[in-house]
């Protein structure tokens, strides 16, 4: 395979001639080259062997990883198959359950429909049976009607034969008899019903009103507007009049009040139809007398300041009364008009305190009977608001007050209750009747109001005159300060049932022709006396 080393050396020597150093190098190369070739061959073999071992190791590692991955894939595949199997089983179970529920619901629905159908069939059968019964009853009624008509014809002929009366004459007699019997029966029934109704109503009314009055418990003395101012001395009358009457003219012009200086010792009288202006004049005159400086400029200053003070007092009084009555949301103008009622009186009763008492009573009674409390107490508080301006506007104070309340935003129910509290409008609501009732209770209780002697006597005479204006009345007496009228009737002219009608007619005429506080009781007395003598 290789040539001998000596032969190669000889061939090299033959080819060229070298120096000694070159010969040494060549000789070294000759010896080193084979060794190098051998080393390279050995290294290449070792490298190939190492590379082969490395490749085989990697192949074994890759095969191991592939086997592990294959096993993991197979395990995951098994898990997926198991989960899919479980899910399919669950879905199948749920589907079967839903199918069973749907079948059960369908069966129940079919059962209900079956029952409804059976009930409907029974109802149809019942209706058909009832229809047959009605038809049979109609035939029976028709037969009875024919029999009755036949009997009526027979009776009519018999009556005409017996009484020798015509049909019209017999009908008139029968109708009159039936009318008399019906009237008497109706009067008896009315008396029984009224007796029962009055007993129950009086019992309930006493209970409700007593509870309301006890809870209200208003305690005050009726105020009277003072129009007389006391003077410390008679000399002040001349100072009030002033030089050539300039002081009194300035005072009357600024206040609109007439000052009456007469012979009354140490007093002057203030005269004016407006109680507010009269109060302003009274307070201003008292201040001028205390101050001592009385001249037109000072009078103008004091009157202006007093007007502001009275306006403030009216607002405060209106707010106080609204607060005590627990009525909220009133317009400022309504508050001021309420305050003006402080200076108004009705038969000696202060109108502002009367309105407050009515509001408290209305609230308590409305709570007892289930009426609208807010409407009742608000309408009761404002029911006399028209009296604050009724001298400035023409018309009944109830309608004036209702118009003011409507214009200032009160509800139609409140406006109607105010307008109807003196029957200027027909009461249509429970609250309207309630305001009438509390107005009568507050004004009609003993001591609340008073009348002059002349008015009192005239009212009693008017009551007796109304009662004696009816036929059959013998005498009439007004008793209990005009709160009851006792009517004595002629027993031959009016019977017991006629007494009921007479009492109602007298009460109705009193309501239509007279004005009075509270209510008036009408008692009709029919007395029959049988007298004989034993000899």
Curated annotation (Swiss-Prot):
Assigned GO CC terms: plasma membrane
Topology relative to the membrane: Single-pass membrane protein
UniProt KW keywords: Cell membrane, Endonuclease, Hydrolase, Membrane, Nuclease, RNA-binding, Transmembrane, Transmembrane helix
GO biological process, one term: mRNA catabolic process
Gene3D superfamilies for the chain: Hypothetical protein af1432, K Homology domain, type 1
Domain KH span(s) in chain numbering: 225-285
Compartment annotation: Cell membrane
Transmembrane segments: 30-50
Occurrences of domain HD (ranges): 351-444
InterPro entries: HD/PDEase_dom (IPR003607), HD_domain (IPR006674), HDIG_dom (IPR006675), KH_dom (IPR004087), KH_dom_type_1 (IPR004088), KH_dom_type_1_sf (IPR036612), Ribonuclease_Y (IPR017705), RNase_Y_N (IPR022711)
Matching SMART domains: HDc, KH
Enzyme class: hydrolase
GO MF annotation, one: RNA binding
Enzyme Commission code(s) on record: 3.1.-.-
Family, per entry: Belongs to the RNase Y family.
NCBIfam families given in the database record: HDIG, RNase_Y
Role description: Endoribonuclease that initiates mRNA decay.
Listed name of the protein: Ribonuclease Y
Species in which this protein is naturally found: Roseiflexus castenholzii (strain DSM 13941 / HLO8)
């Amino acid at each position: 395979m290789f040539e001998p080393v000596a032969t190669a050396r000889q061939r090299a020597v033959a080819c060229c001639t070298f120096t000694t150093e070159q010969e040494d190098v060549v000789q070294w190369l000759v010896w080193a080259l084979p060794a190098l070739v051998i080393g390279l061959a050995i290294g290449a073999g070792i490298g190939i062997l190492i590379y082969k071992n490395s490749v085989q190791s990697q192949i074994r590692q890759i095969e191991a990883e592939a086997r592990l991955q294959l096993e993991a894939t197979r395990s995951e595949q098994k898990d997926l198959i198991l989960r899919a199997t479980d899910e399919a089983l669950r879905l199948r179970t749920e589907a079967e359950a839903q199918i069973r529920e749907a079948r059960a619901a369908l069966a129940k629905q079919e059962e209900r429909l079956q029952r409804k159908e059976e009930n409907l069939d029974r109802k149809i059968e019942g209706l058909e049976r009832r229809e047959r019964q009605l038809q049979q009853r109609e035939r029976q009624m028709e037969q009875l009607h024919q029999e009755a008509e036949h009997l009526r014809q027979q009776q009519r002929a018999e009556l005409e034969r017996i009484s020798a009366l015509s049909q019209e004459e017999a009908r008139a007699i029968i109708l009159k008899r039936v009318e008399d019997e019906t009237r008497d029966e109706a009067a008896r029934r009315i008396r029984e019903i009224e007796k029962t109704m009055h007993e129950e109503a009086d019992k309930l009314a006493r209970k409700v009103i007593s509870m309301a009055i006890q809870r209200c418990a208003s305690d005050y003395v009726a105020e009277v507007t003072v129009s007389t101012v006391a003077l410390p001395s008679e000399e002040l009358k001349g100072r009030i009049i002033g030089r050539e009457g300039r002081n009194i003219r300035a005072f009357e012009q600024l206040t609109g009040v007439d000052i009456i200086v007469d012979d009354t010792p140490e007093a002057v009288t203030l005269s004016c139809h407006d109680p507010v202006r009269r109060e302003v004049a009274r307070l201003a005159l008292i201040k001028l007398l205390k101050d001592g400086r009385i001249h037109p400029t000072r009078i103008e200053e004091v009157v202006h300041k007093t007007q502001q003070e009275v306006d403030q007092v009216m607002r405060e009084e209106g707010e106080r009364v609204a607060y005590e009555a627990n009525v909220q949301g009133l317009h400022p103008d309504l508050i001021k008009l309420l305050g003006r009622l402080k200076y108004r009186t009705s038969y000696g009763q202060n109108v502002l305190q009367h309105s407050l008492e009515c509001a408290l009573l209305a609230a308590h009674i409305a709570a007892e009977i289930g009426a609208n409390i807010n409407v009742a107490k608000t309408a009761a508080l404002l029911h006399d608001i028209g009296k604050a301006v009724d001298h400035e506007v023409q018309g009944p104070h109830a309608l004036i007050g209702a118009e003011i309340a409507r214009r200032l935003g009160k509800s139609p129910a409140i406006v109607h209750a105010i307008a109807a509290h003196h029957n200027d409008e027909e009461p249509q609501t429970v609250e309207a009747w309630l305001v009438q009732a509390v107005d009568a209770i507050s004004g009609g209780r003993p001591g609340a109001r008073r009348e002059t002697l002349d008015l009192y006597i005239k009212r009693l005479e008017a009551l007796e005159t109304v009662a004696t204006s009816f036929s059959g009345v013998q005498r009439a007496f007004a008793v209990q300060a005009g709160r009851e009228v006792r009517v004595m009737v002629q027993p031959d002219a009016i019977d017991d049932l006629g007494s009921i009608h007479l009492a109602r007619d007298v009460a109705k005429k009193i309501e239509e022709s007279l004005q009075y506080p509270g209510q008036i009781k009408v008692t009709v007395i029919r007395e029959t006396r049988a007298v004989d003598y034993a000899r």
